[in-house]
Amino acid sequence: MGMPSWLENIVFYEIYPQTFLDTDGDGIGNIQGIIRKLDYIKNLGCDGIWLNPCFASPFYDAGYDVADYKKVAPRYGTNEDLKELFRKAHEKGMKVLLDLVPGHTSTDHEWFRESCKAEKNEYTDRYVWTNNVWDDFKDVGSITGSIRGFSDRNGCCAVNFFSVQPALNFGFARCDKEWQQPMDAPGPMATREAMKDVMRFWMSMGCDGFRVDMAGSLV
């Protein structure tokens, strides 16, 4: 699939939701505030909005630590508010891109809680784990850190940035370590399908596409 033609010349206005217009007086910007300012953004000459992370999160990293990919953070509003933003932006001939963080989640994500369990389950291989808590990732250049000693599982989990952001398992092109899985292993394949499901979910509501955060962490 090629690049959509509308991407060739579009001008985007980037919005970090909590710093934009606050419509309910809690001191935090929200999606309704963005809706109110669509004409303002359009009049600036922008025909697209790039919305920084707006999903449910504990916000240890400005929302780039996602706890639920299919739920808008309550501080910003609801899923229906975001759906309304898509619709009203389209009425004005504007596009909306969401920030997608596919390389890692929050440690608060249900996937990670399940992956931490000693018992084998469908999320055991959703993240990058070693086979022993004493094994780390010092010889793997693509991994910058790890967390360990906090779960029932005997293993060390890779992180992509901060210690609250465990790395999702998309597999490895070359497997040099016992714990590494190839890209076509069941775990990595399930991770990719889960992320495709997230994208389908929001596009069915009217999202026009995604800006992928830390895309390099996927390869």
What is the role of each PLM region?
Residues G2-K196, S204, R211, A215-V219:
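Acidic/aromatic-lined carbohydrate-recognition and catalytic surfaces
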